[in-house]
Swiss-Prot record:
Protein name, entry field: DNA mismatch repair protein MutL
GO cellular component: mismatch repair complex
Pfam families: DNA_mis_repair, HATPase_c_3, MutL_C
Origin organism lineage: Bacteria, Bacillati, Bacillota, Clostridia, Eubacteriales
Biased composition (Basic and acidic residues): 455-465
Gene name as annotated: mutL
Region described as Disordered: spans on this chain: 443-469
Biased composition (Polar residues): 443-454
């Protein structure tokens, strides 16, 4: 083994500079952050030859005390902290005291500075770590820092620099990020005498976005915001029109510090994906303002990464804020005229009335007064070919005591529609529409009296116990788009409708899929999940990592309709699964949901998220090439109007698109 040597100060500084000063952009970042910490309002950056020959930073900040000028260039000298505990309450961008000595050890540096109370300024020159005397000079309040001939004494580092244009581009990028996080500061960047960036420091974030990215970008961004006890999440996310094939236009800031965090970026991308049909990455600018004690900024040499105490919590807050903003934007494009809204509001004070079952000798009649709906019917809405049959199959089994749930819209008027039957256990069922009354008939005989009485008892109890709560929920059910008039079906896949001169096309599969998807989530909220026992429990062997996530989310699986028991070690046994999802592969479903939880973090049961539920919902939804009659189409559209988000299927594909008369006239060149 070789002998141990103690490195001299010059060698140690050059090695340290390798971590902090990677390239000219690193120097610009450190010096501009120092200017921001000095309370500057105007910062000018000048570079030549990509920053390798000259970097000049001019600010109007507080300046440096004469006695501190030399100390500022000593290793670990800083005005930001005094003790190690101060790191966990830091509110400045710099704090280590490494940048200036690192830069001074590999470049020729000249510093001029003046405080407001001083009569003159002071100047010092450092070349390769060697100091000159501090002398008086004429200079305005603030600091001027010149860095020339970067890496002049470390040629091995200099040869690894990229081309001048590439290094200039990296400097441009870092100033862009810093300007976005400081809209109250005016930034000017000059490259070889040419102005590249100029922000005005008026505090208007959209003005900064317009200056940096252009008018087309600022016109296609949406604001989002969410707050909690420890953090505030806010920023802008781009619409689908400005999505790109790379993540270059994505910025994340924590307490005004530009960072890189893949997980938080995925939170925005997942929310964006719910409303996008393109395989591109969204434009976004994300700000996280959080109490310093909940993060650790001292985990990376360049401070470009931050560690959160609870990153899953931050992930969910970001996802929720972005998702809500995008959802509201979609809803605004399908607005209902004001006069229609007023008419709807006058008719939404529904009285909740008990559902009564009339038992006759040879038939069971379920009478629904469509002006008096129970909330359970609203929660259980379905649509299918045959839509009513799907509901019946799901809720009405001969070996269970589950009440029948059917929901037919008020405005359906048809004489006599027979539904095809491919289930021998439910013979001769049909729907009879008589004015505003809808009767569901079946050939169950008096042998079913026990079932009928059980249904009546269950519904009576539920009606009495939930009248108050459900009436409040019903009032919240409002249509998200107008009551369009059905005019036909195209290619057995798309439903055509019109309203006020606008043509609507609805993807029947995507629409029904979304209705089923929201029904499952609503069932979880209502505690109304129907489960099916497995004849043979499915045993799944999990890794230690997967098992820990399962343990953490046991309640999530339970409330979503899964009965799971430990099977020794890290193995589990699936005994019961949600009946709603029909025929499925329990193991695959469980692992899909578990993967979602690993990506999104644990949370409310309604966050047993999109992939697993949406994929399974697809399998029993109305398909393309399914012929629907007018009653079925009207029912499907009416149900779609009242769900929380009728405009996108769980995969993010649109369920409904619209064409105004102007759009169509342009296609036929009636107007230009």
């Amino acid at each position: 083994m070789k002998r141990i040597n103690i490195l001299n100060e010059d060698t140690a500084n050059k090695i340290a500079a390798g971590e902090v000063v990677e390239r000219p952009a690193s120097v610009v970042k450190e010096l501009v952050e120092n200017a921001i910490d000095a309370n500057s309002k105007n910062i000018l950056i000048e570079i030549e030859e990509g920053g390798s020959s000259l970097i000049r930073i001019i600010d109007d900040g507080d300046g440096i005390y004469k006695e501190d000028i030399e100390k500022a260039f000593l290793p670990h000298a800083t005005s930001k902290i005094k003790e190690s505990e101060d790191i966990y309450s830091i509110n400045t961008l710099g704090f280590r005291g490494e940048a200036l000595p690192s830069i001074a050890s590999v470049a020729r540096v000249n510093l001029k500075t003046k405080q407001e109370t001083e009569e003159c300024g002071y100047e010092i020159t450092i070349e390769g770590g060697k100091f000159s005397e501090v002398t008086e000079c004429g200079v305005n309040k603030g600091t001027i820092m010149e860095v020339r001939d970067l890496f002049f004494n470390v040629p091995a580092r200099k040869k690894f620099l990229k081309t001048t244009s590439k290094e200039s581009s990296l400097i441009n990028d870092i100033i862009t990020r810093i300007a976005l996080s400081n809209p109250n500061i005016s930034f000017k960047l000059f490259n070889n005498g040419k102005k590249i960036i100029h922000t005005y420091g008026n505090g208007n974030m959209k003005d900064v976005i317009r200056t940096i990215y252009g008018k087309s970008i600022v016109e296609n961004v949406l604001y989002f915001e969410d707050t909690s006890d420890i953090a505030t999440i806010y920023g802008y996310v781009g619409k689908e029109a400005i999505a790109r094939g790379s993540r270059n236009n994505q910025s994340i800031f924590v307490n005004s510090r530009y960072i890189k965090n893949r997980s938080l970026g995925i939170a925005v991308e997942q929310a964006f994906k719910s409303f996008s049909t393109v395989s591109k990455f969204p434009f976004f600018i994300l700000f996280i303002e959080i109490y310093p004690e909940y993060i650790d900024v001292n985990i990376h040499p360049t401070k470009s990464e931050v560690k959160f105490n609870d990153e899953r919590f931050i992930f969910k807050k970001i996802f929720g804020a972005v998702h809500t903003s995008l959802k509201e934007e979609v809803f605004s494009t399908f607005s209902i005229p004001e006069e229609v809204n007023e008419a709807i509001s006058k008719n939404t004070n529904l009285n909740i009335e008990e559902i009564t079952f009339k038992i006759e000798e040879e038939q069971e009649k379920v009478k629904f007064n469509t002006n008096h709906l129970s909330q359970k019917n609203i929660c259980s809405t379905q649509g299918n070919n045959s839509i009513n049959k799907h509901i019946y199959d799901e809720k009405h089994k001969t070996d269970t005591n589950i009440p029948l749930n059917v929901n037919i819209p008020v405005d359906l008027k048809s004489d006599h529609i027979k539904l095809e039957d491919d289930n021998n256990s439910i013979p001769n069922k049909e729907v009879i529409c008589d004015n505003n009354e809808v009767k569901y008939e079946s050939s169950y005989t008096s042998d079913s009296n026990q079932y009928e009485n059980s249904c009546k008892s269950d519904v009576d109890k539920e009606s009495k116990s939930k009248t108050t709560g459900t009436s409040e929920l019903v009032k919240e059910k409002i249509p998200k788009f107008p009551a369009i008039k059905i005019i036909g079906q195209y290619n057995k896949t798309y439903i055509l409708g019109e309203y006020a001169g606008t043509l609507y096309m609805i993807d029947q599969h995507a629409a029904h899929e979304k209705i089923m998807f929201e029904k499952y989530l609503n069932d979880i909220i209502c505690g109304d999940i129907i489960i099916q026992p497995l004849m043979i429990p499915t045993v799944i062997d999990l890794s230690m990592d997967d098992y820990s996530y399962f343990e953490e989310n046991k309640d999530v699986f339970k409330e979503a309709g899964f009965t799971i028991e430990d099977f020794g070690g890290t193995s589990i046994a699936l005994k019961e699964v949600p009946y709603f999802l029909g025929k499925l592969k329990p193991k695959n479903l469980f692992l899909e949901i578990l993967d979602n939880l690993k990506n999104l973090g644990s949370g409310k049961t309604t966050e047993v998220k999109y992939n697993a539920i949406a994929t399974k919902a697809c399998k029993s939804a109305v398909k393309g090439n399914d012929s629907l009659d007018e009653l079925e189409m009207v029912k499907l559209i009416e149900e779609l109007r009242y769900i929380d988000d009728p405009f996108h299927c769980p995969h993010g594909r649109p369920t409904i698109i619209q064409f105004t008369s102007t759009d169509i006239d342009k296609k036929f060149r009636r107007i230009v």
